[in-house]
Amino acid sequence: MKRFCIACALILLQTLWGPLDARRFSISTNLLDYARLGTLNMDASYAASRHWSVTAGARYNPFTFREGDPDRQFQYRQQSYALGARWWLWHTWSGWWFAGKARYQEYNAGGLGDRETEEGDRVGAGLYLGYTHMLAPHLNMEFGLGFWGGMSWYTRYSCPACGVVTDQGQEYFVRPDDLMISIVYVF
């Protein structure tokens, strides 16, 4: 009886899950995000059909540079989470794609260019366009760009370390988001 129940459960799982064929999942990392003061990032995707994939991603940057010298300190600290979907013109993991994402970001940025620092939270949605080039059966290179907009709750300071508040509030924003050159592993 136990074997029968296990067999029924496996058949039910395969029926609900769909066919277990190759190239349904991928993980990727955007190489250009590392140039943004060492922002660590990872995306995971699932091919829901031939033309659609769903994606989830995270970015994390805990780094503060020149922390011991308040006059020269700078940072782009953040944690960011996104959920989205892609529509592929040809088929998933190859060719042109369009995407939409919902995103949350907690950030603290400043000290580069001018001394003003801003920290806060952003919530919004974005639109993206890109191209994925197949390098090998399981390895792709991805190029893309996008914009996102939404609501920002912020506090601005006169410098990265002094704590003097110059402004705070909330505002709508539209800004460039991803400039992507990503390595993608498909499995």
Predicted regions, residues:
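Generic cytosolic/nucleocytoplasmic N-terminal low-complexity/intrinsically disordered segments
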Residues: 1, 29, 100-102
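Cleavable N-terminal export/targeting peptides
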Residues: 1-24, 187
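Short glycine/proline- and aromatic-enriched beta-strand/turn motifs that initiate or cap beta-hairpins
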Residues: 18-70, 172, 179-187
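Extracytoplasmic loops and strand-loop junctions of Gram-negative outer membrane beta-barrel proteins
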Residues: 24-27, 66-69, 110-113, 162-168
